[in-house]
Amino acid sequence: MKNVIIDLQIASEDVTNLPSVEQIQLWANAAIRAENSQPEMTVRIVDEEESHHLNLTYRGKDKPTNVLSFPFECPDEIELPLIGDLVICRQVVEREATEQEKPLMAHWAHMIVHGSLHLLGYDHIEDDEAEEMERLETEIMLSLGFTDPYIIEK
């Protein structure tokens, strides 16, 4: 299996409690499982202002969000290893981890896995798609040594 090449961009004023590029690569590799090519993706960690702006611009949602996925699409005749970009909001991830009583790094891992699956074309708009995506996310998270991300323990 070939490693995903990660271009990590940190556009957050607070850089504490962020995953390392090695952690992000491990989590993305588990989701992408590249066999032949060596895919490349950008992971941009942002603050709420940038997340809010992008979420409003591209999804029409007037609030910051945990992860946005921007798949890279090019003509079929051009072979490029780029699979896309993930934009992850540090404050939203931290807040969700606290609210859901999950370890912070487990939630970061889940956001990388979730976003990576979106880059591969998975979605959760329809119920059957959501079930398949959640099943895959759970399988990947368990393989990484984390718990089921959809079970909230209280």
UniProtKB/Swiss-Prot annotation:
* Co-factor binding details: Binds 1 zinc ion.
Looking up PROSITE patterns in the UniProt record yields:
UPF0054
Keyword annotations for this protein? Answer: Cytoplasm, Endonuclease, Hydrolase, Metal-binding, Nuclease, Ribosome biogenesis, rRNA processing, Zinc
In short, the EC number is: 3.1.-.-
- Cofactor or coenzyme needed: Zn(2+)
GO cellular component terms, A-Z? cytoplasm
Any single biological process term in GO: rRNA processing
Supply the Pfam families for this chain: YbeY
Question: Which amino acids does the record list as binding Zn(2+)?
Answer: H114, H118, H124
Q: What does this protein do?
A: Single strand-specific metallo-endoribonuclease involved in late-stage 70S ribosome quality control and in maturation of the 3' terminus of the 16S rRNA.
Matching entries from NCBIfam families are given as: rRNA maturation RNase YbeY
* HAMAP family, per the entry: Endoribonucl_YbeY
**What is the protein name given in its UniProt record?**
Endoribonuclease YbeY
The gene that this protein is the product of is ybeY
